């Protein structure tokens, strides 16, 4: 049976808000997506440092306590990112290393992430990208830029 997100606080958050991928992002902006993906693949086993919303995510996932089963959880943090799937692997490995319960993610490989907010039943979208926040707000979703 699929997991239901009904009745939960679902916070969708970008990977750059959770983890500090600013150096990698500069490679993407300076070079191209192939160089960016190669760098992320090269650093796959290197946990990323916390991003601007790292402490917030830690508090959100700790809200249910360590013993909360999937059915008992009231808060779900979902990564919604323009990143590619290889970078997604690094996100989840970094989360595991940091002790963060991040189990779901959407990696759009450059496409805008806000269309995924409805299927995820997201109550809030947080991102370090002001354009993505503006697009989500324009589409009627509660959103905020974290910095």
Regions from the language model: what does each represent?
Residues 1-147:
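HAD-like aspartate-dependent phosphatase fold
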């Amino acid at each position: 049976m699929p997991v239901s997100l009904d009745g939960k606080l679902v916070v969708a958050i970008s990977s750059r808000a959770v983890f500090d991928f600013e150096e990698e992002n500069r490679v993407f902006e300076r070079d191209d997506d192939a160089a960016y993906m190669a760098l992320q693949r090269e650093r796959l086993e290197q946990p990323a440092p916390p991003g601007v919303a790292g402490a917030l995510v830690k508090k959100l996932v700790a809200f249910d306590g360590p013993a909360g089963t999937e059915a008992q959880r009231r808060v779900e943090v979902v990564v919604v990112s323009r990143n590619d799937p290889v970078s997604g692997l690094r996100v989840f490995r970094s989360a595991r290393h940091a002790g963060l319960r991040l189990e779901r993610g959407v990696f759009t490989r450059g496409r805008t992430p806000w269309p995924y907010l409805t299927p995820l039943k997201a109550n809030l979208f947080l991102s370090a990208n002001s354009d993505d926040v503006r697009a989500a707000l324009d589409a009627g979703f509660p959103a905020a830029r974290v910095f």
